[in-house]
Amino acid sequence: MEKVYNFCAGPAMIPAEVLKKVQEELVNWNGLGTSVMEISHRSKEFLAVAKQSEKDLRELLSIPSNYHVLFCHGGARGQFAAVPMNLLGDANTADYMDGGYWAHSAIAEAKKYCSPNAVDITCEREGKKAILPAREWSLSDDAAFVHFCPNETIDGIEIRDLPETDKPIVADLSSTILSRPIDVSKYGVIYAGAQKNIGPAGLTIVIVRDDLLGKAKQEIPSIFDYTVLVDKESMFNTPPTFAWYLAGEVFKWLKELGGLEAMKQRNDAKAELLYNFIDGSNFYNNDVHVDNRSFMNAPFQLKKPELDSKFLEQADAAGLKALKGHRVVGGMRASIYNAMPIEGVQALVDFMRQFEQKNA
């Protein structure tokens, strides 16, 4: 079988080593004679999976003991609603930093529950898309929390700093979680859809500080109430067990590779390889300022956009899949999450070089 590299923004690549292990034990997991998909979420076998996966995630992220880890349904869009319903308390506003498509989507959802202070933090620097430094963000005094999306997957824009504030910081880390070390103690809530760096779609991770529990609005659906989910240990209803199990296998894989510092070095090398090639080319362009380029999602444009379809068709034939940019911005996009090996990025660069030579 021809080697295929999947550059999809999500659902994204899952580590080949993990997929192989899952395949081998799919129909007879742990000698039970059944699949892990078929066992009760309350069985001792699955409870052991749940306990170990949380333990491994806590170790990877160095999560302090005063934070709870939840394994939920609903994706990041579910959290767009859950966050204000859980954290507003008696307040009627929260600060929402608008850095792109996903932040804007969170703001639109928040308007159902409060009057968000939406702050446009985008700017232009040296003719490129950029983000204002966090010290220049306009925060309000009466906000219940500060929400932002550190990595906008569509535009390929990443925010690298945090604001100085005494309000809880809430971050949508769907596309960057586990890609490098972070200081969890600087956040009030972290949430992430699983389908980029954690595992298959259907699972959502929420990390919430203990003092933020108990503020939920009375009308909040129980399935979104952080306090209920903490009390029930993420098993208020049947959780996405297969996605949870597979996430646990990804956590083990990350630990075997050396943890998040090792993953950071791996991801830095991939991004450097791709961006250096684009910057050295007169045929391709990236329109994001170097200070805010995403390490996970690298959009690029051909100087001859009429060749886009040809590029995508030939790339696909070469085993380089899902490189089409988001419909909002067009062009191309290479999502190079944790599971993408540097060999995949090298294969992409080699193809891009050959395509340029033939079509410049």
UniProtKB/Swiss-Prot annotation:
Its main location: cytoplasm. Belongs to the class-V pyridoxal-phosphate-dependent aminotransferase family. SerC subfamily. It is found in: Cytoplasm. Its cofactor is pyridoxal 5'-phosphate. SUPFAM superfamilies: PLP-dependent transferases. Catalyzes the reversible conversion of 3-phosphohydroxypyruvate to phosphoserine and of 3-hydroxy-2-oxo-4-phosphonooxybutanoate to phosphohydroxythreonine. This is Phosphoserine aminotransferase. It comes from the Bacteria.
